[in-house]
């Protein structure tokens, strides 16, 4: 928890960092701790002030959908899933009943569909329709334990992971998406399953999802470990 004194110290640090950046001086390694403090402050503001588990992102009419969203470039050398029928989602960690779920099992669970605006950290946005199973329903099915505070999401691409706080993960608009724009989720957008929420920036939504783990400790992530904001809220 950040108290008032720490809040003021971080705010002052943010102003100093802005001045440093404006002067075009990187300060060497000495500035890094200050920048990390500012990043943590931004995460705190996003999570504790702007985010609410009851606040929903606005929805749009299907007619307002925009052109196809930009997507990952898929290299021919990338080990894509050759047999989608063999794909499974591993759910474990702080749950009473760890499970291995097929796509058919996920599609048989309660379904959420919405048309929302997707926001990328690079500055572009687009409107699309997504459908899938609420992550909260998967947590309930597996018996999430009260000690759980975070969720780690792993892609089939070894080493690519993401971490969310539990409140964001259990938000009613957080889904494990298997469909986009009235069609099955395409490979370029993370088929057969991806994490999706209109309350987060795009880099927080793990594609090609193969496992999720409920934890008591805050997990890192591929982009977050390189300096991107951990909370990543819109």
Q: Could you tell me what each predicted segment is?
A:
Residues 1-18:
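N-terminal secretory signal peptides and thylakoid transit peptides that target proteins
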Residues 21-22:
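C-terminal motif of bacterial Sec signal peptides marking the signal peptidase cleavage site
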Residues 25-234:
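Structured, non-membrane catalytic/scaffold regions adjacent to prosthetic-group chemistry
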């Amino acid at each position: 928890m950040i108290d008032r004194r720490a809040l003021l110290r971080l705010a002052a640090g943010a102003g100093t960092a802005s001045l440093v950046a404006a002067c075009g001086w990187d300060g060497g390694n000495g500035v890094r701790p200050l920048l990390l403090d500012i990043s943590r402050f931004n995460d705190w503001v996003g999570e504790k002030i702007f985010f609410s588990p009851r606040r929903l992102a606005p929805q749009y009419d299907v007619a307002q959908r925009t052109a196809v969203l930009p997507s990952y470039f898929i290299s021919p050398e990338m080990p894509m899933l050759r047999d989608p029928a063999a794909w499974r989602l591993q759910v474990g960690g702080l749950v009473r009943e760890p499970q291995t779920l097929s796509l058919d099992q996920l599609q048989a669970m309660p379904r959420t569909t919405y048309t929302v605006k997707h926001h990328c950290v690079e500055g572009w946005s687009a409107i699309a329709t997504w459908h899938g199973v609420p992550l909260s329903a998967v947590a309930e099915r597996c018996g999430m334990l009260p000690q759980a505070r975070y969720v780690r999401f792993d892609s089939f691409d070894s080493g690519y992971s993401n971490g969310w706080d539990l409140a964001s993960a259990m938000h009613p608009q957080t889904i494990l998406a298997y469909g986009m724009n009235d069609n099955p989720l395409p490979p370029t957008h993370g088929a057969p399953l991806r994490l999706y929420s209109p309350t987060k920036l795009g880099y927080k939504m793990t594609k090609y999802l193969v496992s999720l783990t409920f934890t008591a400790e805050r997990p890192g992530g591929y982009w977050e470990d390189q300096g991107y904001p951990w909370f990543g809220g819109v």
